[in-house]
Amino acid sequence: MSFARRPNRSFRPRSLASLMTILVCFCLALSRTVAGETSSAGTEPAFTGLRVDGKAVSGRITAITADRITLDSDENAKEEVPFRFLVKLARDPRLPTQTPEGSHVLLPEGDRLMRVIVGATTDTGVEVQSQSALGKLTIPLECVLGLILTAPTESDAFDQLWNRVAGETRPTEVVWMANGDRLTGGFLGLDDRAVKLQIDGKPVEIDRTGVVAVGFDPTVVSYPRHDSSYLDLTLADGSRLGVTDARVERGQVVATARFGQPIRVPIGDLIRLDPRSDAVVYLSDRKVDAQDNSGYFGAPRPLRVDRTVDGHGFQLGGHTYDRGLGTQSQTLLAYRLKPGDRRFQALVGVDDRAGPLGSVVFRVLTDRKPRVTTPPMSSRDAPLAIDIDISEAKLLILITEFGERGDVRDLADWVEARIIR
């Protein structure tokens, strides 16, 4: 990450950070006791899910192995569901939005740790104390895209900062200051007092209280991916981690995070599990082969991956989603299909943020043949699920067209757009 070569020193958190950690842990334990959030064996929540064939599945998670999940229904019936047959399991489709409270660690591919205390950070690793059951974690710095240390309280400003830290191309480390300044240099570390950079060959200490965020060079970020199946776990605080070697022990999911640290999460703290296998491929992970954008008024806005076209998380019908394609009418996206691609599935609609003015028509074509055409949709309309056979097709085309008012507030969402293989 453009690291300057310095002696390997540990910047230990001082008394203030230690006191904050103790207070957070005490408040977390108290809130869980009051709210009764901590689950014990036999009281785990029920999850509902979606299989790749479109059928629903539900039950309490009782076992996880390398390639399947076991669910117990209310009728005490056990069902083993292989990862490759399952799209998702969710306790509540209203995934938590990314909130400005606290500090946040941004990892590649949408993984993140929300509402943490960032402690000692060197040019090799960062120590964080999570307010969730994840507790204390040490993350290799090569796995980190950035740190939001002091988040803006206004949601639009927070999303803009998040997008810069997560998606900006930068050849070196960047420090964003509360006064609007932007500093670049080689990262040396941070503690509870200062962020340390090497600027023009000289070490510089920057008062941490004035630092909003730190972004690392994304070209040298390395995030291990398992050779076969793994799980994405989403927690109630909005954190999401990819994990391997998952299993269930006494009402907890025990696993290894993709950055190598063992974790334990009570099932009651999980709100969603996404099996990641080669059977379900999200279009946000596939390169679009061709796209065309033509606005009605002003300059068109191109496709955004895993964000709405104006840079926010997806919200459809009051529900929040992590993955998808954000477009604006009029947009055409073309994907060359691969041998083994069987079905295309997505949830489409106009994002809740569009308000009453947005109006969009969604169309799906295969090999230029119309397969789906929706009526004009606004944010007041319920999202529509699309599920079509593409096994004989070579080209998948997704189109958003002008509805009733040109492209005014046309925030067109293709939520969880995916190929079933």
Predicted regions and their residues:
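Extended non-catalytic domains of envelope/secretory-pathway proteins
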Residues: 41-45, 51-280, 335-336
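Short, solvent-exposed linear motifs at loop/edge-of-secondary-structure regions
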Residues: 6, 236-240, 343
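Bacterial N-terminal signal peptides
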Residues: 17-32
